[in-house]
Amino acid sequence: MNPLVFTVIMSTVMLGTAIVATSSHWLMAWIGFEMNMLAVIPILMKKYNPRSMEASTKYFLTQATASMLLMLAVTMNLVYSGQWSVTKPLSPTASTIMTLAMAMKLGLSPFHFWVPEVAQGISLPSGLILLTWQKLAPMSILYQISSTINLDLLMTLSILSIGIGGWGGLNQTQLRKIMAYSSIAHMGWMTTILAYNPTMTLLNLAIYILLTTTTFMMFMLSSTTTTLSLSHTWNKMPLLTTAILLTMLSLGGLPPLSGFMPKWMIIQELTKNDNVILPTMMAVMALLNLYFYMRLTYSTSLTMFPSTNNMKMKWQFNYAKSTTHLSPLIILSTLILPLSPMLALLE
């Protein structure tokens, strides 16, 4: 892709998200979503092949349907209340439809089917944008309407997402699909706490984006897309492979790594609100995610796949690509937990 064209497209993607996050008028929010969707499709099709075309088509159809539901919710709200303001409370029916539209855009269960398929059909840089940046706009809308969301609907979507995110990743060997199912589970955790403490949702989103960005950048650096190729990186880059495995365990929520902090805070917040059954179910289902990350760690670090003696010596040679930019990301992705007492200052 021409660098100038790519710059224009990326600018449009960012502008679309910024319009959604800052607009106070529902029509402008819808325009921002459409700008973002139409600009991100060429990024998904950057490596032109049948799989990326199929993935882009699935993404377009899902997002277009969600945008249509958004406009339906806005129109119904206009009929009920006669106003277009994002900051004013939505009517109950409009709020339910809007929640479903945003769930479809985020890939929450039961609207999650497109996420693993699209993530698998595109390149790693495109997958990074899909699973991080593309979550910002829908989450900003959910944050703004959090006071009027139907709590039962939200909890149902959340529990389903955490469960499906765990079950779906169990039999996967493709790392992009594993990251997609992990994304579904993380979105479930974020939406659970949305009605109780919306600010905590934003903190959770920031940590999720940090962990996912670090993991994808390390995959790109090592050109890794499957569990088999991940096991071979141990011979070439042992330090980077160790960092990948630690970041993945952090994504799974294993203490004392950074990924444990948002889960801990969400469970604490739910129990403060006299909710015991829900966090117990969430904690049990989070073990499914942790299990497939632990299995990945085991197969990579504690077992050696068949390889020649020449392959085992590759770590001795200098690696051409620079890894300087990864150092702060890896540190943040694994060592935020000791800083968590400072978050008490935010309350």
Swiss-Prot record:
Q: Is Transferase one of the keywords UniProt gives this record?
A: no
What catalytic activity does the UniProt entry give for this protein? a ubiquinone + NADH + 5 H(+)(in) = a ubiquinol + NAD(+) + 4 H(+)(out)
GO molecular-function terms, A-Z: NADH dehydrogenase (ubiquinone) activity
Q: Which Pfam families match?
A: NADH_dehy_S2_C, Proton_antipo_M
Specify the domain of life of the species encoding this protein. Eukaryota
Keywords tagged on the record = Electron transport, Membrane, Mitochondrion, Mitochondrion inner membrane, NAD, Respiratory chain, Translocase, Transmembrane, Transmembrane helix, Transport, Ubiquinone
The UniProt entry, under InterPro entries, shows: Complex_I_Subunit_2, NADH_DH_su2_C, NADH_UbQ_OxRdtase_chain2, ND/Mrp_TM
- Ranges that cross the membrane: 1-21, 25-45, 59-79, 111-131, 149-169, 178-198, 201-221, 237-257, 276-296, 326-346
Class in the EC hierarchy, top level: translocase
Q: EC number(s) on record?
A: 7.1.1.2
Q: Name one GO biological process term.
A: mitochondrial respiratory chain complex I assembly
- Main localization category: mitochondrion
Assigned protein family: Belongs to the complex I subunit 2 family.
Q: What does this protein do?
A: Core subunit of the mitochondrial membrane respiratory chain NADH dehydrogenase (Complex I) which catalyzes electron transfer from NADH through the respiratory chain, using ubiquinone as an electron acceptor. Essential for the catalytic activity and assembly of complex I.
PANTHER family documented for this protein: NADH-UBIQUINONE OXIDOREDUCTASE CHAIN 2
Q: What subunit structure does UniProt give?
A: Core subunit of respiratory chain NADH dehydrogenase (Complex I) which is composed of 45 different subunits. Interacts with TMEM242.
- The protein's name: NADH-ubiquinone oxidoreductase chain 2
Q: Which organism is it from?
A: Pteropus pumilus (Little golden-mantled flying fox)
| Source organism phylogeny | Eukaryota, Metazoa, Chordata, Craniata, Vertebrata
